[in-house]
């Protein structure tokens, strides 16, 4: 399952690089009234589009050229395609790059704010009424998009929608490393001792480890991307695979815990312990929710090739995923509210309240930051969502860690049995994750 998903991610990521390779195809250009090469968010006054081709003679014979459209012109054309003839569409291009030399560096006009530019291939056959396939030599190309760096030189491969993510993941990895150096030994000793929170901490630690690997993989991918505009697609796919696995594991953990408490409470008296029960109902609900989330996440990947784990591209799969998270938060709120209102123990009640905070932050951070992102410009939205959700999920994990560790310490110091604690884990449950 994981290997199949990794292969899917690898296939989806083929169009993510900002140094693009390919072939210029007259047939594709004729059918589409232009062959789309790439779209990129340029900014500043020294942005450069660098074009290389291998067969100048064939390109010159076809009168090949790259047409550059700003976002406004492109939207205008595609909002009313039937109103424009092929020559009229070409006349709306901001500029044209004739492909009559091996390498061409085009400096874009100064931009007060970031703009999306569309690069389209056109030749003398594009606007013909009828086209017969011409047997000619292939023309391969390489197009590199470069924004000005901090010194104003055109060496930055990141688009305006991606700038800052490299630094963010570096800072995130650094924080994870420092936190690991400080807390890893104490956490390991706590987990070796066992206790009522042992299995919960193992599952939570696995989910956190997946997030750490994802952050490190994203940083390595973006570091390579900064130098060549291509990155490391395998590493980028690994980052997304870890993100999906972490999301799935946390969903199963939080939902099965809450459903187990809710269902077991109907069968047990107040004085008996609450356990992470392996009831068919709680397990079935958790598995159903996890399956639905995996389907939506994979569907979302196919709908957006530039996937960054969380993004502003509002597809049907994305909207369904957001709706699912809101519904899960509401259902957990109802279940925990019923438990809290009838709970007489102050310690247990505080435990459930803190657990609810961690759950709501985990499930609602994505929908909330999607809504908040609409306050920003379009090219900033993906960064707002990505940074906001990752930080919020990290805070949620900290809340849950503090909660479970504090109760483990309370159990150890007071030498109480697990019967007096608000959460215990049955030994039979442990095999579900580590069998």
Swiss-Prot record:
It is a multi-pass membrane protein. The keyword Signal applies. InterPro entries: GPR180-like_N (IPR053880), GPR180/TMEM145 (IPR047831), GPR180/TMEM145_TM (IPR019336). The keyword 4Fe-4S does not apply. It is found in: Membrane. Its main location: membrane. The chain crosses the membrane at residues 168-188, 200-220, 244-264, 282-302, 320-340, 355-375, 384-404. Keywords: Glycoprotein, Membrane, Signal, Transmembrane, Transmembrane helix. Residues 1-17 form the signal peptide. GO terms for cellular component: membrane. Glycans are attached at residues 100, 105. GO terms for biological process: G protein-coupled receptor signaling pathway; response to pheromone. This is Integral membrane protein GPR180. It comes from Xenopus laevis (African clawed frog).
């Amino acid at each position: 399952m994981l290997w199949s998903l990794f292969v899917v991610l690898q296939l989806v990521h083929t169009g993510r690089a900002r140094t693009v390779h390919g072939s210029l195809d007259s047939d594709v250009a004729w059918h589409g009234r232009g062959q789309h090469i790439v779209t990129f968010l340029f900014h500043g006054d020294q942005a450069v589009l660098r074009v290389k081709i291998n067969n100048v003679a064939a390109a010159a014979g076809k009168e090949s050229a790259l047409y550059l459209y700003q976002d406004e012109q492109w939207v205008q054309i595609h909002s009313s395609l039937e109103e424009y003839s092929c020559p009229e569409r070409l006349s709306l291009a901001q500029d044209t790059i004739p492909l009559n030399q091996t390498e061409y560096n085009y400096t874009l006009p100064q931009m007060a704010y970031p703009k999306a530019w569309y690069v389209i291939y056109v030749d003398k056959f594009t606007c013909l009424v009828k086209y017969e396939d011409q047997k000619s030599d292939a023309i391969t190309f390489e197009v590199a998009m470069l924004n000005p760096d901090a010194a104003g030189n055109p060496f930055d491969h990141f688009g305006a929608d991606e700038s800052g993510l490299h630094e963010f993941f570096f800072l995130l990895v650094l924080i994870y490393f420092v936190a690991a150096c400080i807390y890893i030994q104490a956490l390991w000793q706590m987990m070796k001792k066992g206790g009522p929170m042992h299995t919960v901490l193992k599952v939570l630690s696995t989910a956190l480890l997946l997030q750490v690997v994802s952050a490190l993989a994203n940083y390595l991918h973006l570091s390579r991307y900064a130098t060549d505009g291509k990155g490391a697609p395998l590493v980028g796919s690994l980052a997304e695979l870890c993100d999906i696995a972490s999301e799935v594991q946390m969903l199963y953990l939080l939902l099965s815990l809450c459903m187990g408490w809710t269902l077991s409470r109907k069968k047990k008296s107040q004085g008996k312990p609450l356990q992470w029960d392996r009831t068919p109902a709680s397990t079935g609900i958790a598995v159903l929710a996890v399956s639905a989330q995996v389907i939506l996440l994979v569907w979302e990947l196919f709908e957006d090739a530039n996937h960054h784990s969380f993004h502003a591209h509002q597809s049907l799969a994305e909207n369904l995923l957001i709706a699912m998270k809101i519904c899960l938060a509401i259902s957990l709120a109802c279940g925990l509210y019923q438990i809290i209102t009838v709970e007489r123990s102050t310690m247990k009640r505080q435990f459930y309240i803190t657990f609810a905070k961690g759950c709501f932050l985990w499930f609602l951070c994505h929908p909330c930051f999607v809504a908040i992102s609409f306050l920003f410009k379009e090219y900033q939205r993906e960064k707002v969502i990505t940074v906001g959700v990752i930080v919020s999920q990290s805070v949620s994990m900290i809340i849950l860690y503090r909660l479970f560790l504090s109760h483990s310490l309370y159990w150890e110091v007071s030498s109480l049995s697990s019967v007096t604690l608000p959460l215990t884990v049955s030994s039979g449950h442990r095999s579900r994750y580590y069998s």
